[in-house]
C-alpha cells in the first residue's frame, strides 16, 4: 500500500496519508472552505453544499471526499467561489440573519461566522418564512423558520446518540425536522439528551434556558424584535456592517456570560463540558469534541439537570439541633460543637467509636481529606464510601484475578470491540453516553451485543441476543461457558501459557459446571449458552460490562470473579477493545475509593496493615496510624446497634435512604450519641443529625473526579458558593484545625500534590497536566505518562501473571411461598439515585414525578390490577406503597422499583430500601439489594399512571434510519447541486 499521496492544494504540493478526509486536510493547512453542515464529531452529512471545491477539474463536495489517489484541488478559483456562494445563498433563503438580537450570537454561530469569513455582502435569494410555529420541549425548542436543514440534529439523534427520534421530512413542500411521526417534541420518544441543540450550527435548535437570556436585547417581544430586525437591515447596505455590529455585541456578552469547564456530577461516565453562566443563572451546557470521555454527547441529567445549584432547598448556613429542633448558627459555633463532641467521644470510648462515610459525589481531594481526618486527626480506620453499596464486589473480583480494581481500558475500547457482553447493567439509563457508543457501534459498524439481564430494558431490546437468567445465577452460566470453551479447545492456550497461572487447579474446579447444570440453574437453554460460548471464544475482541445486577447479590464478588476468569481463558485482556468493565455508578466512586476512603486501604489501595505503607503516611502526617482495619458502612450500622460506634460523620450521602434495610439503619441513627451530616440539602438522613453543614456542589469549587475508565479530570469553579456554604475540603480543614491540627491548604491543587507524593497510582498527577480538557488514566507514572489500557506490561502481581480463581455455586433461585414476588431495582434515565439533586429541576420532576413499581402484564392480569393501581409491597423487613406501571419490561413475578423516591419531599415513603434486607456479599459486605422478595396487596385496582403521559416510556416507539437520508433531498425537483450550476 502506498504510504503517502501527492495532493496539490491551490498550487502547492503536499504528501497526504491515504484515507484522509479532504475537508479535514484542507482545514489542517489553514485554508478556509465553508462547511456549515460538517462537524468533526459526526463526519460528512452532505446537505449544505458549501464545502465545494474543484477536484481534478470537477466541482465536488470536499466533506465526503476521501483522498485515495493523487489529486489537484482548487479552493479559490471563480467556479468554486460561485458554487460556494450559491450554496450560501440557499442557506440564507431559509435563515434570517438578525444576529445582534439573537441568543445564539455568542461568537460560535456557524452561519454568521461562515458568511463573515467568506465575505458575503448580499444574498441573492430573499428569505422565505415557513408555515410552522416554534415547537417547545421541556428543555429545548425548535424554530423551523431558522432551520437550514443541515441535518446535524438528525445525525446526532440517529447515529451518535442513537435515540432514533429525529428526522427530516423531505417530502413536504417545505421540509422540516420532525419528531417520530410528526408529533410535538414533548409527545415524542425523545429522551432529552440535548445533543440536537449542542450540534445545531445556529439558533434553530436551542436550549430553553438560552432563549431571551443570552444577549443584551434578546428578551425583546417578538413584534418589537421583528421591527428591530427590519430597521437594522434597511439602515445597513450589506452584511459587512451588520456583522460588525453583531460582533461587537457578541464581544460584550463575554463580560456577562462565563464559560467554565467542568465534569458532570452524576454517573460514572465522566462527561466533561463547558457550563455557561450569567450571574448564577445556568444558560447551557456545551460539550466539546475535546471532551475525552463523551465527545459531544450528553444525557438529560448532564445537559439539563442543574436545578439543584440554585434550588431554594439549598442549605446556606450551618444547623445545630437544640432542644430537638434545628437552628441556624454561625460556622464557628457549629465547628465548636463538632470538635467538642468528637473529643469527648474519643476520650470516653476511644477513636474507634467514631466513624466516617465519604461521598462519591465529592472530589478526589475532598475524599482524601475525609480519610485523612479520620486517620490522622481522630486515629481510626472507620472510613468508607458508597462503593460498599455497589462496586466493591467488582473490585474484589478484579483484585483476585488481574490485580487492579478498575476498567481494563477506555470507553473508546467499548465502542471498538467486536463483541460487547452486558451483564446486570441497564446501561442505556444508568450510563447513557456509554450505551450510545455501543448502540452506534452496533448500528454502523456491526458490533455484536449480548445482554444477560432479568429485565428487558433498552439494551436488551436492541441486543443481537438477549438472555434472561433467573435472579442471582450469573456465576453458573459464566462458569459453564468457560468450561465449555476449554472442553472444546476454544481457549487461548498461548495467552494462558504466557500470562496466566493456576490453570489446572481452576479447570478442575469447573467439573460440575456443565451446560445442563447451567440450564437448570439459570433457565437459559443449553443450546443458547453453547452458541454464546462459541461466539465469545471466536470473537476478535470481547469486552464485558457489568453493574449492580451482578454486584448487589450475595455472591457478587464470586460472580465478578467469574467474569474475569472467562476473559482470561479467552485471552481478552492486554489488548485494545478487550477486558473487564465494571461500570461505576457515581461520578467519583472510582476516585473516592482510589483516595483511601476505605477501612482496609489507604490511597491507591495500599494496605493499612502494611508496616511500610503506614510508615510512609506517618512521616507525612506526623502521627502514628492505627494498624487495625476499620469498619465498613455495613459494620458501622451493626456497630451502632452493638454499642461500639457512638458517632457518625457523613457527607454527600443519603445513607438513611440508600442503604439496605433502612428501618434498621434509621434505628441506628437514633442510637448515635452524635451525628454530623454535610450536604447541599437537608436530606432525609440529615434530619437525624445533630449538626448539619452546608456544602457546595461541583460548580462552586475546583477539584478532580476519576471516572469509570480511571480517567482523572479537572473541574473548575464556575460560581461562588451559595450563602455561607463551603466546599467540603474547606470544611474538613476547619474541623481538623479546631481539633488542634495545622492544615493549611490554599487550593485543591496542593491536596493533589500531597496525594501524588503518597500514591503510586497517582504519582504523576498534577493540575498542570490536567489543564482544560486534558486528562490522565491511572496508573500515572512520575513523568506524567499514563495507561489507557491496563496490563500491557503484565498483570498487577509480582510475577506479572494473572490468576484464575476457582469458584463454586449453590445459589439456586427459589421463590418463597409467602413472599412470592422477586423485587428488582435500579435507576431511571431522568433521575440519579434517590433523586435529591434531580428532583430540584422542575422539568425532570415533570417527566418522572415519583417512584413507582413496574409490574408485568401477566402479574397485573393475575391480580386484577391496571395502570395506576396502588399496591402495598410487604417484605420481611418493611413495606412500601407505590403506584403501578404495567410493562413488558418485566415478566411473571418479577417487579422493578426505581431508586428515586424524592425523599426530601416524601421521606422514605415508597423507598425501595424499606423492602431490602441486611444480607450481604460475604467478602465485601455489599448489600444484596437484588436478592429481595415481597408479597403484594392491592389497595386500588386502577388509577392515574405514575408516569407523565408525555414520558418516552409510554407508548412511544423509536424511528430508526441511517443518517439524514440526504439522497431524498437530492431527489427533490427543486434541488440542483451548486457545482452543476456553474457556467463552465
From Swiss-Prot:
[2Fe-2S] cluster binds at residues 37, 48, 51, 63. [4Fe-4S] cluster 2 binds at residues 147, 150, 153, 200. Coiled coil: none annotated. It catalyses: formate + NAD(+) = CO2 + NADH. Residues 3-79 form the 2Fe-2S ferredoxin-type domain. Disulfide bonds: none annotated. Residues 138-165, 181-211 form the 4Fe-4S ferredoxin-type domain. [4Fe-4S] cluster 3 binds at residues 157, 190, 193, 196. InterPro entries: 2Fe-2S_ferredoxin-like_sf, 2Fe-2S_ferredoxin-type, 4Fe4S_Fe-S-bd, 4Fe4S_Fe_S_CS, Asp_de-COase-like_dom_sf, Formate_Dh-H_N, Formate_DH_asu, MoPterin_dinucl-bd_dom. Binds 1 [2Fe-2S] cluster. Binds 4 [4Fe-4S] clusters. The keyword Cytoplasm does not apply. Residues 257-313 form the 4Fe-4S Mo/W bis-MGD-type domain. [4Fe-4S] cluster 1 binds at residues 95, 99, 102, 109. Pfam families: Fer2_4, Fer4_7, Molybdop_Fe4S4, Molybdopterin, Molydop_binding, NADH-G_4Fe-4S_3. GO terms for molecular function: 2 iron, 2 sulfur cluster binding; 4 iron, 4 sulfur cluster binding; formate dehydrogenase (NAD+) activity; metal ion binding; molybdopterin cofactor binding; NADH dehydrogenase activity. Residues 252-984 are annotated as: Formate dehydrogenase. Residues 79-119 form the 4Fe-4S His(Cys)3-ligated-type domain. GO terms for cellular component: membrane. The keyword rRNA processing does not apply. Its cofactor is [2Fe-2S] cluster; [4Fe-4S] cluster; Mo-bis(molybdopterin guanine dinucleotide). In the C-terminal section; belongs to the prokaryotic molybdopterin-containing oxidoreductase family. This is Putative formate dehydrogenase SAB2186c. It comes from Staphylococcus aureus (strain bovine RF122 / ET3-1).
Amino acid at each position: 500500500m502506498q504510504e503517502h499521496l501527492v495532493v496539490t492544494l491551490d498550487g502547492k504540493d503536499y504528501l497526504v496519508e491515504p484515507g484522509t478526509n479532504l475537508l479535514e486536510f484542507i482545514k489542517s493547512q489553514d485554508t478556509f472552505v465553508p462547511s456549515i453542515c460538517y462537524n468533526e464529531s459526526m463526519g460528512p452529512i452532505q446537505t449544505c453544499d458549501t464545502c465545494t471545491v474543484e477536484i481534478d477539474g470537477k466541482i465536488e463536495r470536499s466533506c465526503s471526499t476521501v483522498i485515495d489517489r493523487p489529486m489537484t484541488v482548487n479552493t479559490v478559483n471563480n467556479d468554486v467561489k460561485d458554487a460556494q456562494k450559491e450554496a450560501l445563498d440557499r442557506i440564507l433563503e431559509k435563515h434570517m440573519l438578525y444576529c445582534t438580537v439573537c441568543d445564539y450570537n455568542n461568537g460560535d454561530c456557524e452561519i454568521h461566522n461562515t458568511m463573515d469569513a467568506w465575505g458575503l455582502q448580499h444574498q441573492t435569494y430573499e428569505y422565505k418564512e415557513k408555515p410552522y410555529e416554534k415547537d417547545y420541549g421541556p428543555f429545548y425548542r425548535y424554530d423551523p423558520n431558522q432551520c437550514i436543514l443541515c441535518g446535524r440534529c438528525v445525525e446526532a439523534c440517529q447515529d451518535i446518540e442513537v435515540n432514533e427520534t429525529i428526522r427530516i421530512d423531505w417530502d413536504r413542500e417545505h421540509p422540516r425536522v420532525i419528531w417520530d411521526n410528526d408529533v410535538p417534541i414533548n409527545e415524542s420518544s425523545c429522551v432529552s439528551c440535548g445533543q440536537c441543540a449542542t450540534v445545531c450550527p445556529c439558533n434553530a435548535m436551542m436550549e430553553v434556558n438560552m432563549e431571551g437570556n443570552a444577549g443584551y436585547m434578546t428578551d425583546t417581544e417578538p413584534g418589537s424584535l421583528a421591527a428591530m430586525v427590519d430597521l437594522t437591515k434597511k439602515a445597513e447596505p450589506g452584511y459587512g456592517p451588520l456583522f460588525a455590529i453583531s460582533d461587537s455585541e457578541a464581544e460584550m456578552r463575554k463580560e456577562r456570560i462565563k464559560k467554565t469547564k467542568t465534569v458532570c456530577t452524576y454517573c460514572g461516565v465522566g462527561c466533561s463540558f463547558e457550563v455557561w453562566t450569567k450571574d448564577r443563572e445556568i444558560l447551557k451546557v456545551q460539550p466539546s469534541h475535546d471532551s475525552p470521555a463523551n465527545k459531544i454527547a450528553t444525557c438529560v441529567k448532564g445537559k439539563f439537570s442543574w436545578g439543584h445549584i440554585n434550588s431554594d432547598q439549598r442549605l446556606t448556613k450551618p444547623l445545630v439541633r437544640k432542644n430537638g429542633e434545628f437552628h441556624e448558627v454561625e460556622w464557628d459555633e457549629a465547628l465548636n460543637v463538632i470538635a467538642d463532641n468528637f473529643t469527648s467521644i474519643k476520650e470516653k470510648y476511644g477513636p474507634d467509636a467514631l466513624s466516617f462515610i465519604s461521598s462519591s459525589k465529592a472530589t478526589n481531594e475532598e475524599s482524601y481529606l475525609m480519610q485523612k481526618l479520620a486517620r490522622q486527626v481522630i486515629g481510626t480506620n472507620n472510613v468508607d464510601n458508597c462503593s460498599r453499596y455497589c462496586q466493591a464486589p467488582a473490585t474484589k473480583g478484579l483484585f483476585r484475578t488481574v490485580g487492579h480494581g478498575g476498567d481494563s481500558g477506555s470507553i473508546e475500547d467499548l465502542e471498538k470491540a467486536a463483541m460487547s457482553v452486558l451483564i446486570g447493567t441497564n446501561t442505556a439509563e444508568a450510563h447513557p453516553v456509554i450505551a450510545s457508543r455501543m448502540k452506534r457501534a452496533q448500528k454502523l459498524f456491526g458490533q455484536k451485543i449480548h445482554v444477560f439481564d432479568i429485565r428487558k430494558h433498552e439494551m436488551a431490546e436492541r441486543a443481537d441476543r438477549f438472555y434472561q437468567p433467573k435472579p442471582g445465577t450469573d456465576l453458573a452460566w459464566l462458569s459453564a461457558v468457560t468450561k465449555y470453551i476449554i472442553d472444546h479447545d476454544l481457549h487461548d492456550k498461548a495467552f494462558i501459557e504466557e500470562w496466566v497461572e493456576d490453570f489446572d487447579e481452576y479447570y478442575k474446579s469447573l467439573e460440575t459446571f456443565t451446560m445442563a447444570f447451567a440450564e437448570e440453574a439459570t433457565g437459559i437453554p443449553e443450546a443458547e449458552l453453547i452458541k454464546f460460548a462459541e461466539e465469545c471464544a471466536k470473537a476478535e475482541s470481547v469486552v464485558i460490562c457489568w453493574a449492580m445486577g451482578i454486584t448487589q447479590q450475595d455472591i457478587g464478588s464470586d460472580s465478578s470473579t467469574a467474569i474475569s476468569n472467562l476473559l482470561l481463558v479467552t485471552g481478552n485482556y492486554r489488548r485494545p477493545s478487550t477486558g473487564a468493565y465494571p461500570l461505576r455508578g457515581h461520578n467519583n466512586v472510582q476516585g473516592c475509593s482510589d483516595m483511601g476512603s476505605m477501612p482496609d486501604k489507604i490511597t491507591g489501595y495500599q494496605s493499612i496493615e502494611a508496616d511500610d505503607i503506614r510508615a510512609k503516611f506517618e512521616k507525612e502526617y506526623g502521627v502514628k496510624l492505627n494498624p487495625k482495619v476499620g469498619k465498613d458502612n455495613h459494620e458501622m450500622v451493626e456497630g451502632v446497634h452493638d454499642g461500639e460506634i457512638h458517632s457518625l460523620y457523613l457527607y454527600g450521602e443519603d445513607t438513611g435512604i440508600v442503604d439496605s434495610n433502612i428501618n434498621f439503619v434509621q434505628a441506628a441513627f437514633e442510637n448515635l450519641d452524635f451525628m454530623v451530616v454535610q450536604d447541599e440539602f437537608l436530606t432525609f438522613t440529615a434530619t437525624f443529625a445533630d449538626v448539619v453543614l452546608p456544602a457546595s456542589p461541583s460548580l462552586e469549587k475546583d477539584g478532580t473526579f476519576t471516572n469509570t475508565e480511571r480517567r482523572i479530570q479537572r473541574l473548575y469553579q464556575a460560581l461562588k458558593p451559595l450563602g455561607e456554604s463551603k466546599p467540603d475540603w474547606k470544611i474538613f480543614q476547619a474541623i481538623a484545625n479546631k481539633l488542634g491540627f495545622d492544615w493549611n491548604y490554599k487550593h485543591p491543587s496542593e491536596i493533589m500534590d500531597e496525594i501524588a507524593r503518597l500514591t503510586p497510582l497517582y504519582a504523576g498527577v498534577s493540575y498542570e497536566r490536567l489543564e482544560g480538557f486534558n486528562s490522565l488514566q491511572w496508573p500515572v507514572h512520575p513523568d506524567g505518562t499514563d495507561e489507557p489500557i491496563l496490563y500491557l506490561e503484565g498483570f498487577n502481581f509480582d510475577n506479572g501473571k494473572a490468576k484464575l480463581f476457582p469458584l463454586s455455586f449453590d445459589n439456586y433461585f427459589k421463590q418463597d411461598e409467602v413472599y412470592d414476588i422477586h423485587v428488582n431495582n435500579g435507576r431511571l434515565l431522568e433521575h440519579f439515585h434517590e433523586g435529591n439533586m434531580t428532583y430540584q429541576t422542575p422539568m425532570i420532576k415533570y417527566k418522572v414525578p415519583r417512584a413507582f413499581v413496574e409490574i408485568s402484564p401477566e402479574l397485573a392480569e393475575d391480580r386484577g390490577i391496571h395502570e395506576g393501581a396502588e399496591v402495598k409491597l410487604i417484605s420481611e423487613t418493611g413495606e412500601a406503597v407505590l403506584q403501578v406501571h404495567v410493562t413488558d419490561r418485566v415478566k411473571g413475578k418479577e417487579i422493578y422499583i426505581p431508586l428515586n423516591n424524592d425523599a426530601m419531599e416524601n421521606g422514605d415513603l415508597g423507598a425501595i430500601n424499606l423492602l431490602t434486607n441486611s444480607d450481604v456479599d460475604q467478602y465485601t459486605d455489599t448489600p444484596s439489594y437484588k436478592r429481595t422478595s415481597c408479597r403484594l396487596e392491592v389497595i386500588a385496582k386502577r388509577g392515574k399512571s405514575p408516569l407523565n403521559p408525555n414520558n418516552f416510556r409510554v407508548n412511544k416507539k423509536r424511528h430508526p434510519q441511517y443518517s439524514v437520508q440526504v439522497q431524498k433531498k437530492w431527489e427533490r425537483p427543486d434541488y440542483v447541486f451548486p457545482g452543476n450550476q456553474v457556467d463552465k
